[in-house]
Amino acid sequence: MHKPLIISVVGAGGKTTHIHRLAEKYLKQGKKVLVITTTHMYLEKDTILELENDMETSVGRMKDALAQGFCMAGSPCEEERKMGPLSDHVTEQILPAADVVLVEADGAKPVSYTHLRAHET
């Protein structure tokens, strides 16, 4: 099975901008780029949202977008203009279709860094 390069971007600010710069770099190299999140991320115009009641259609749409080179995907989120993480089921199906996966991977909010608390080790 094909395993993509996975890059997780973390920090208090600039994650989305950095992800877009990385995406441009890899797209210029002819790579198929998937952008996802583990938390919440701004819902951009061409984002494909996972349909809870029709995951196979969602995966098909994501694979079609990746065949064209780029896919930003997430799940519907209660916060307006945000997307959430994909389900594990959809993630497992879509990752092999990408060459590079860029992940917005934390929710630092207004703090400059995050760290594990004692109960998280």
Predicted regions and their residues:
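Solvent-exposed alpha-helices and their adjacent loops that cap or buttress functional pockets
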Residues: 1-2, 27, 63-66, 93-96
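Walker A (P-loop) phosphate-binding motif
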Residues: 2-26
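General beta-strand structural signal in soluble alpha/beta enzymes
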Residues: 9, 34-37, 72-75, 101-107, ...
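Short active-site-proximal "capping" loops at secondary-structure junctions
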Residues: 14-15, 39-43, 78
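Short glycine/serine/threonine-rich phosphate/pyrophosphate-binding segments
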Residues: 18-20, 110-113
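N-terminal phosphate/diphosphate-binding loop that engages ATP/GTP or pyrophosphate donors
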Residues: 24-72
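Phosphate-binding/switch loop-helix module in NTP-utilizing enzymes
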Residues: 78-112
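Conserved small/polar residues in nucleotide/adenosyl-binding loops
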Residues: 114-121
